[in-house]
Design a protein with these regions (language model features):
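A beta-strand signature from Gram-negative outer-membrane beta-barrel systems
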Residues: 82-84, 140-141, 185-224, 237-239
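Gram-negative outer-membrane beta-barrel transporters
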Residues: 541-543, 564-654
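Outer membrane beta-barrel strand-and-loop segments of large Gram-negative receptors
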Residues: 375-379, 420-427, 431-433, 510, ...
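Short, acidic, small-residue-rich periplasmic hinge/interaction motif at the N-terminus
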Residues: 15-21, 28-33, 61-68, 75-126, ...
Length: 767
């Protein structure tokens, strides 16, 4: 076999990093142009390139979008350890002209149904209240449907919001929201890389049905002390990073906090003593990202990272004390080890905790409601690349889960009244995987298998999850792709509404609630137009078993038998057209995304006698346009300056809703005038909201001083056309004046809109 012929080959391997801060570069390219060989760095910055052994030097070229190309010669003898540092583009005035290496590599890859997000674009695009948000940018990608307006909910290819595996430095984030879903937990200043898989899932991922959102934090500048920050309308943030020991270890700490509570507190104090003044509730959120890393040896590196975030809502008066807080805590310890030029390993220990608590104290009486989920995970991944055409990945993980579902406590101060309910569950989740990628001339194959198991006494489940993907290069511009993936999900989110609320409950698989299973098939094409535009078309079909929904009239809180409130059925979704046109280079960059899709759920015996219905996230047409234009660059008084215009446009078909189809008038006794009007509900979700349309505009003015201090002012207009989009529809009963008094006579649906045109101004800085 060719990959066993080690005597005739040499291997060049090492890491690729940013020369200014030491950050590893993910997906950077290494090529031997004279031999037609090449490869790229993995998610940990490690690369390996096999070359024919000889006595003549071979030229290697290292490239990465946004960085200067580096060329050098090596003597291909045995194992060559070569760590590379690439210099980023320097001045704001520099025109970085790079061939579309990234787009062409994406076209050639077996990966499909994958999107990556640039943090540079995230910070430039207009945003709600000026708060840049990587999750909201994901909503602009095809195949991803947003939740309600302004929220960070993600419904990927017909899946529910709980079917997204969101990981931060490999630790699971169970609730990625602040402010009831209007902002995400991710501070873009602390994020280095974000990648989302919508299908064709690699075998190393498991545990959710619809997507994997892999977020990786920056590692910290190991060259010098530096910082970034910003001041906006509702929050400020600051990030500091620097070396602990230059070139050997570094740290990063990033903090963000809102300050509306400081203003409301001042207003409340100013109106103390006014009997007609109603106090304003106090609300704020904050989050903190930290990370340190140490180069222990040329072959070993240790990373320690953590995240802590919390939302706090309080309201106090002399007889009433209400507090509602929720948040996440995660921790990761990761060890990278290079066994040799072709074998790399990553060992990770992670901890995740999400909890919420509502506490209310009245005179002589107290009430609290809370829930939490905790994970402790151990994972080992191996990356073996015997030659440039063959890559093997294998590994496994063990996760311990602990769930506390809706713990309710109530009681009086004198002890006469006391009530407590809620249950605690635990479970063990196991996974093992292997995948193999081969390249044969124009054909690349990636196939693998994942074994997942769940143990929760007395239930036990074991499932085999096959994965496969293929890429055939028709020519130097066109590739044909196909993929298949089976996924299992052993934890379920019991959500009482279409919103992503902090009071939603995570619930494990049991004997009565089986794991959800999905199968997805996708086919597509990737075409490189010119050297800067990639056109991607995909069609997909996904079917799901053991889908979880609520029975009509389900009760969640204070219920120790939640399984009795659940209905189990099926779901399917499909799209003949998921299109993306993206341009990453030049003065004008951005993308256009469009999805035509159908989603159906059914076979629930307790819901509409098993009939299929459209869930809330079934939107037929989804169109997004994102544009960033580097309008002008100039130099004045020793300062590099630039002006950038940005815009986004979104169109989404109306989503389904369950509204009354009729009414019944009731009276106190036969023959009397009606005193009550009761709405009558028919089959689920037969009504559709009006279409959602929004245009956002932004302008970014940047200037860089001679001392390297960078500034930018970002002016955003959210909903620039002031369109009143529906947030929800409320049902109102209208009355009629009669000799007998006011009597109800008609039920009307009224649209409630949330956001008009909203301007914002944010100052960002970097030093």
């Amino acid at each position: 076999m060719p990959f066993l012929s080690r005597a005739q080959n040499a291997t060049v391997s090492g890491s690729m990093r940013d020369s200014q801060n030491g950050e590893t570069l993910i997906g950077a390219n290494v090529q031997a142009p004279g031999l037609g060989k090449g490869n790229s760095s993995n998610e940990y910055g490690f690369y390996s390139l096999t070359l024919p052994e000889g006595n003549d030097s071979i030229e290697l070229r290292f490239t990465y979008i946004g960085y200067q190309t580096k060329t050098l010669k090596v003597l291909p003898r045995g194992a060559v350890l070569l760590d590379i540092q690439l210099a980023p583009a320097g001045s704001l005035l520099e025109e970085v002209v790079i061939k579309a290496n990234g787009l062409d590599e994406k076209r050639k890859s077996t990966e499909m149904s994958v999107s990556t997000i640039s943090t540079r674009d995230v910070k430039a695009l207009p945003a709600l209240f000026g708060e840049t948000d990587i999750i909201k940018i994901l909503q602009l990608k095809p195949g991803i449907t947003p939740g309600s307006e302004g929220t960070t909910g993600l419904f990927v290819r017909g899946g529910n919001n709980d079917q997204n595996l969101i990981v931060l430095d490999e630790a699971v984030v169970y609730n990625a929201n602040h402010l009831f879903g209007f902002f995400s937990t991710f501070n873009s200043d602390a994020v280095k890389d974000l990648k989302v898989y919508k299908g064709g899932f690699p075998a190393q991922y498991g545990g959710r049905l619809s997507s994997v959102i892999d977020v990786r934090m920056k590692e910290g500048n190991n060259k010098k002390l530096s910082g970034t920050g910003g001041i906006g309308l509702i929050s400020s943030r600051l990030t500091l990073e620097g070396p602990i020991q230059k070139d050997k270890s570094s740290f990063i700490i990033s903090a963000r906090r809102t300050y509306a509570d400081i203003i409301t507190e001042a207003v409340n104090k100013a109106n103390e003593g006014d009997p007609e003044y109603n106090k304003i509730p106090r609300y704020f959120f904050y989050d903190l990202n930290t990370k340190v890393n140490f180069t222990l040896s040329p072959k070993d590196r240790l990373y320690l990272s953590g995240y802590f975030g919390r939302d706090v809502f309080t309201f106090k008066d002399p007889s009433f004390d209400f507090r509602f807080d929720w948040g996440n805590a995660t921790g990761s310890a990761r060890w990278n080890h290079v066994f040799g030029p072709t074998l790399f390993a990553n060992t990770t220990f992670t901890y995740s905790d999400y909890r919420y608590k509502i506490a209310n104290e009245l005179q002589g009486f107290s009430f609290s409601l809370g829930s939490n989920v905790m994970d402790a995970n151990t994972k080992v991944d191996f990356y073996w690349q015997p030659n440039n055409s063959h890559t093997v990945r294998f590994g496994g993980n063990i996760t311990y889960h602990d769930f506390v579902t809706a713990r309710l406590k109530a009681g009086s101060d004198d002890g006469r009244i006391s009530f407590e309910s809620g249950r605690e569950y635990d479970g063990w989740e196991y996974g093992a995987f292997i995948s193999d990628e081969w390249a044969f001339d124009r054909l690349k194959l990636n196939y693998g298998l994942r074994l997942s198991m769940w143990k929760n006494d007395p239930s036990f489940y074991a499932n085999i999850e096959p994965r496969a993907a293929a890429n055939y290069e028709v020519n130097d511009r066109l590739s044909l792709k196909a993929s298949y993936a089976r996924m299992n999900q052993y934890v379920h989110l019991l959500a009482s509404s279409g919103l992503s609320l902090p009071t939603d409950i995570w619930y494990p698989s049991t004997e009565g609630v089986k794991p959800e299973i999905s199968d997805q098939i996708a086919v597509g094409t990737s075409y490189l137009l010119g050297d800067q535009i990639l056109i991607t078309w995909e069609a997909w079909y996904k079917w799901m078993q053991n889908a979880v929904d609520f029975k009509d009239g389900a009760e969640l809180f204070g219920n120790n038998e939640l399984e009795n409130e659940l209905a189990i059925g099926r779901a399917y979704a499909y799209s003949p057209l998921e299109l993306e046109i993206e341009k990453k280079d030049g003065r004008l960059t951005g993308w256009i995304g469009y999805t035509l899709a159908w989603v159906q759920r059914g076979d629930f015996p307790e819901i509409d006698n098993g009939a299929y219905f459209a869930p809330r996230h079934d939107t037929r047409h989804n169109l997004s346009v994102v544009a960033l234009w580097d309008m002008h660059k100039w130099k004045k008084r020793g300062k590099d300056k630039s002006l950038q215009l940005t815009a986004t446009f979104v169109y989404t078909s109306g989503y389904p809703a369950w509204l009354p189809s009729g009414r019944i008038s009731l009276s106190d006794f036969p023959g009397a005038q009606p005193q009550f009007v009761v709405p009558v509900y028919g089959p689920r979700n037969t009504f559709r909201y009006p279409a959602y349309t929004r245009t956002d505009l932004g302008i970014v003015y940047k200037w860089k001083k001679r001392n390297g201090f960078e500034n930018d002012l970002t002016l955003s207009l959210y909903n620039a056309t002031d369109r009143r989009n529906p947030y929800f529809i409320t049902i109102a009963v209208e009355t009629e004046t009669t000799p007998f008094g006011e009597i109800p006579f008609e039920i009307k649906a009224k649209q409630v809109s949330l956001f008009p045109i909203l301007p914002s101004l944010t100052w960002n800085f970097k030093f």
